[in-house]
Curated annotation (Swiss-Prot):
Localization of this protein: Cytoplasm
InterPro entries: Aldolase_TIM (IPR013785), Elp3/MiaA/NifB-like_rSAM (IPR006638), LIAS_N (IPR031691), Lipoyl_synth (IPR003698), rSAM (IPR007197)
Family membership: Belongs to the radical SAM superfamily. Lipoyl synthase family.
Top-rank taxon, per record: Bacteria
Cofactor(s) needed for function: [4Fe-4S] cluster
The species this protein was found in: Aeromonas salmonicida (strain A449)
Pfam families, alphabetized: LIAS_N (PF16881), Radical_SAM (PF04055)
GO molecular function: 4 iron, 4 sulfur cluster binding; lipoate synthase activity; metal ion binding
Gene: lipA
Full protein name: Lipoyl synthase
């Protein structure tokens, strides 16, 4: 019998400790062979550079987090080398425990009231013209953290009025009305919320989330702010079918979503959901054609695409290549 996992405030639970708390258990098949990465998923990571170290030190100095590091994003070196990062607010401990995600679970600490200003000053110091702000889920907060998002938006606009702001939000489950009231007064330049996967996969991949709820959040934001582009991201390789993904794309368009990111799921550790298949670049290209045919203004589709991958280019409608030359 495994020992109980203690939930101390501010303590990060990862890997096996995190997965032990998931209500819907998935048991890896010991006889199932672990899929090897195909050639198109093999890239040579660049050595650490001054830009990478500068961004990391800037984040540490200002006590800020990036989802690039906390979620073990495979594009970290590329993005940091280009001087970009996706900031993660409200701490680095999530109240959810999705088995595809490498962000730590636990009991988060209270919000840092100085974080919005520290974030804004950091963005000004870095001279960023386009920023993506995301967060952990904060089910412990009355509004799910919506006001903290708004405070960050206000501070960034005060210190860097020319900087465009994209927010990648949680679902505000059970707190949608409070969140919408906040965003009514303080909308971002782009509103992003990820569906992540097909509805059939939700019980295993997104415990605590609801597919229709997420679609409704996107619809309500678009209804409230028709001129604010809405965006969503989906992973492939969890066991879904291409037909299910096409239906997800149709659902997104029916709920007014303008922009799409579609990428390959990668297993963060042996404790996480396994990769069921690696989707070839040609299939991503085909799904991009489907997405554009459905009326998305922009669709970034490819193995290495993530929600905020070259988000500035996506927002401009420029082409984003989602796979890399070896």
């Amino acid at each position: 019998m495994s020992k109980p996992v203690r939930m101390e405030p501010g303590v990060k639970l990862r890997d096996g400790d995190k997965m032990a708390l998931i209500p819907v258990k998935f048991m890896p098949d010991p006889n199932e062979e672990v899929l090897r990465k195909p050639d198109w998923m093999r890239i040579k990571l660049p050595p650490s550079s001054q830009k990478i170290e500068h961004i990391k030190s800037t984040l540490r100095k200002n006590k800020l987090h990036s989802v690039c590091e906390e979620a073990s994003c495979p594009n970290l070196a590329e993005c940091f080398n280009h001087g970009t990062a996706t900031f993660m607010i409200m701490g680095a401990i999530c109240t959810r425990r999705c088995p595809f995600c490498d962000v730590a679970h636990g009991r988060p600490l209270a919000l840092d009231p100085d974080e919005p200003q520290k974030l804004a000053l950091t963005i000004k110091e870095m001279g960023l013209k386009y920023v993506v702000i995301t967060s952990v889920d904060r089910d412990d907060l009355r509004d799910g953290g919506a006001q903290h998002f708004a405070d960050c938006i206000k501070q960034i606009r005060e210190h860097s009025p020319q900087t465009r702001i994209e927010i990648l939000t949680p679902d505000f489950r059970g707190r949608m009305e409070q969140a919408l009231e906040v965003f009514r007064e303080t909308p971002p330049d782009v509103f992003n919320h990820n569906l992540e996967t097909a509805p059939r996969m939700y019980r295993v991949a997104r415990p605590g989330a609801d597919y229709k709820w997420s679609l409704e959040l996107l619809r309500r934001i678009k209804e409230m702010h028709p001129h604010v582009p809405t965006k969503s991201g989906v992973m492939m390789g969890l066991g879904e079918t291409n037909e299910e993904i096409v239906q997800v794309l149709k659902d997104l368009r029916e709920h007014g979503v303008n922009m799409l990111t579609l990428g390959q799921y990668l297993q963060p550790s042996r404790h996480h959901l396994p990769v069921k298949r690696y989707v070839p670049p040609a299939e991503f290209d085909e799904l991009k054609d489907v997405a554009m045919g459905l009326g998305f203004s922009h669709a970034a589709c490819g193995p290495f695409v993530r929600s905020s991958y070259h988000a500035d280019l996506q927002a401009k409608g420029e082409e984003v290549v989602g796979y890399k030359a070896k």
